[in-house]
Amino acid sequence: KKRKKSVDKSYYVMYSIRQSGVLSVDIQLKKGILDVCVLHAISKGESYGYKIISDLEGVIEISESTLYPILKRLETGGFVTTRTAEFSGRLRRYYKITKSGLEKLFAGRSDLQEINVIYKKIFGGRL
């Protein structure tokens, strides 16, 4: 059965719960969370790959092989802009959030808050 594209978030999260009671985070949900985290890191000011990874350290583990496709997707979507500049004899790509990126960040934060409310209702705030 195909799911409708605009599915209520509470249903979507509930659908992801397995019989064991462990929340199975769907790939799309992971993408959304990672996008929000990366946009948040960039929203603090122009940044580059290694700095973004460092800024997110202790919050979420993200590798270069995960980060760069996210950045490319965000750039293609118009959520970040890039510029290339030389740093210590090497070219470095800098990322800057756009107005659309800020809107996506705020919407993503709102979605995460809704998911958190659902999680607390299901699990009583405990893992």
PLM region spans:
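Short beta-strand/turn micro-motifs at beta-sheet edges
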Residues: 24-27, 82-84
